Every structure is written in C-alpha cells, then in structure tokens.
Amino acid sequence: MGDEPLLQKVKIQEDIESVPLLQKVKIQEDIESVKGIRVNNDGEEDGPVTLILLFTTFTALCGTFSYGTAAGFTSPAQTGIMAGLNLSLAEFSFFGAVLTIGGLVGAAMSGKLADVFGRRGALGVSNSFCMAGWLMIAFSQATWSLDIGRLFLGVAAGVASYVVPVYIVEIAPKKVRGTFSAINSLVMCASVAVTYLLGSVISWQKLALISTVPCVFEFVGLFFIPESPRWLSRNGRVKESEVSLQRLRGNNTDITKEAAEIKKYMDNLQEFKEDGFFDLFNPRYSRVVTVGIGLLVLQQLGGLSGYTFYLSSIFKKSGFPNNVGVMMASVVQSVTSVLGIVIVDKYGRRSLLTVATIMMCLGSLITGLSFLFQSYGLLEHYTPISTFMGVLVFLTSITIGIGGIPWVMISEMTPINIKGSAGTLCNLTSWSSNWFVSYTFNFLFQWSSSGVFFIYTMISGVGILFVMKMVPETRGRSLEEIQAAITR
C-alpha cells in the first residue's frame, strides 16, 4: 500500500509522451496530486512578464494614447483654431462633438474588424484612421478638412477603445492581467494631461503634428508583435497559436497547460456557430450582456463625459481657477491611475468597482451640494474648494475603477464566439451614452448647476446596488474559467 502512489506516478510518467496535448494537463495534475502539490488555479506559477509581452502591450497602448490626445486636444486648441480659421462657437462645438460621431462609426465596426482581421489587424485599421486624422487637422485651411480629420480620429478611437483592452486581456498572464489592463486607464489620463501641457505652449498645428508620434510608434510596432493566441486558436490556426503564446511567455516557459486550456475551450466552442448580433439575447449570454451594458451605462450616465468634456465650465462656475484646477486634476488622475494598477490584481475587480462607484456617487453629491449652497448664497466662500474636492473624488473613482475595469471585465467575460457582436454592442452603447451626456450637460448645467450633479448622484447610487448584486469577481481565474462559469 505504501508503494502505490510511487507506482502510480511511474505509470503516469511513462504515459505522458504517448497522449495528446489536452490529456497532458490532466496527467500533470495527477502527478502534482501524487507529490502533494496543489494544482495552481490562481496564477501563482503563471507565465512570466517577458520583453515581447511588454513591447506588445506598449504597441497596443499607443492606440489608447492617441485616443487620449484626441479627447484632450480641443481644450488647449480652442482659442487658436477659432482665431486662425475664423470659426464661430457653434462651428467649434461641432468640431469637438464630431469625435463622438466618428466614435459611433468605429464602434459599429470594431467587433467585426477584430474578428475578421484579428486584434493586430484591427489596430492597424485604427492606426491608419488616426494618422490620417491628425495630418488633416495639422494642415487644415478650412472647416471641412478640420471636421473630417476629427471624424477620422473618432473612428480610430471607436475601434481602439474596444480592441486594445481585448488584445491586452488575451495576451497577458492571468496573474498580471488586471494590472496590464489597468495601465490602459493610466495611459488615457496621462495622454490627456500631456496634450493639455503641450497645447499651452505650442500652436494647435504643431500639437496635431506631435500627436502623430504615437501613431508612428504603433505603426512600426505592429510589424513585430504577435497576434492574439486565442484569436488564432479560434480560427483553427492552432500551431500558430502555440507559437504566438510561446513568444509571449518566453522560450524557457512551459506553455503546455495554458495552450491546452485554450485549445480545449475553443474545441468546446466548435459545437456553437459564430453567434450573430441577435444571438446575444440568448439566455445563455444574458448575464454577460447585462453586466457589460450595465457597467458602461453606469460609467457614462454617471457623468463621465460631463466632467471630462466640461471641466473648465465647472471650475469657472464655482469660482475655482480654471488652469490650476485642470492641471491639478490631471496630476491627481495620473497618480491615482498608478494606484489603480497596483491594487487591481490584489483586491479584485468587483471590490474596486464597488469602492469606485461609491466614490463616484459621493463626488457628484459633494459637487451638487456646493452649487446648491452657492445658489442660495450659503457658504459661498467654500464653494470653489468644495467643488474642486467633489471633482477630484469623482475623477479618482474613474481612474481607480469605473473608467477602465468595465472594459477589462467585458473582455474577460465574453466568450470568443460572441466577442465581435458583444464588442460592437458594448462599444455602441458606450459611445451613444457618451454622446448623450456630452450633448445634454450644457443644457442641464444651465437649467440647474446643482441639479445635473444630483441626477448623476442618483444614477451612481443605483450603480452601487448593480455592482454588488450582478458583477462577478474575475481576479485570478483564466478567461476560459470565467466564461464557462458566467454562460452556464
């Protein structure tokens, strides 16, 4: 009896080379159980962070940086563009808003692009629109070319806002997947801050030209980075998938278990056809769609675009110095984004989302109360600082959770056979909500400077309950485990 585990181990070792790849995973687990070693399901022995993984992530994040420069461009460029091209306020407002129209176009085709051409191919399409957009803006001599350039930037942003987080989630080891994905939010905040800083000291034409630099980096990088192993496997290119995974994990890393897990999951999906848009409403995918759409609606209708697009108007109304407020807000966002990167894989997505949604609600409540007291002539001396504090609390909620984690979780939860359709639906929802909030904010702010923030407070309050009730925890689990559990 005492020799039985040893004999079992010998038999397992003899059989290893004679079985297919999928069975090796089970055999390895048997060996570990014989040795008394716990099978790793938490990513503790997950693949290492390699140079090619870092370079691939950097290349993808250039797309996010370009999106951030587009979002931040209008604030420092407004005076120069209106004077240089003799634009009216209405014409410049249209120039700013056309980004969201382009975003809707990009969002509508993002999922299909990523499915047909791969994640890397979709990034190439996004990069082409981005480069063309910035060059058109930089050399614009008329309103029409300015608007078309801005429209192209929106298309690029609409594609990149979906493809970048999906690509990063699919290539990163699960132990650092949340950290790598959270860098997306940091890059977004940093790019807006950098654009504002540069725009305050150089002309808008030079700012547009400099904004092509991330596009150039991305263009070069796309020639050297691997395609997503999961996309390759889904399309029947198993050998290429294993080669891609080996490059990402390093030549000295045993990818047998991870490759087998991916292949097994993809094989199981073969019994399902490539589901179309209307198949998303199948009860099988109800929770995926509900959580994904719910988080994005919460993100936008909770006031994200209202704060970010009209931050200057908020500070001006409260009496807080605009330049100081915007600069300090950019610094705080960058610092708290770093904090989000550090803690996202330590405390989990759901926990951070709960805290972030509470902060989102609190930030809007403080801002709303500040303007309410101001309207009644109460505590007016404290209105500027209390408004500033409310804005900072809200923006911190964006950087530590509500800004980036919804996209991370959508990428983690969505099975690859509906990723294109679900990505398109989620992206369209996000950009439509973005447009709605950015369009209505000025009207609501004029109607009641406090009322608009109380509306955001109520929406965020509902969001707290939604996160606590509906959102699953995905930290430390493989994509295949997450997707199998949520689509039962």
Swiss-Prot record:
Protein name according to UniProt:
Putative sugar transporter ERD6-like 13
**Location, primary (coarse class):** membrane
For this record, an example GO cellular component is: membrane
Q: Which organism is it from?
A: Arabidopsis thaliana (Mouse-ear cress)
Keywords in alphabetical order: Membrane, Sugar transport, Transmembrane, Transmembrane helix, Transport
Q: Where found in the cell?
A: Membrane
Summary of the function given for this chain in its UniProt record = Sugar transporter.
Gene Ontology molecular function: any one: sugar transmembrane transporter activity
Q: Which PROSITE patterns match?
A: MFS, SUGAR_TRANSPORT_1, SUGAR_TRANSPORT_2
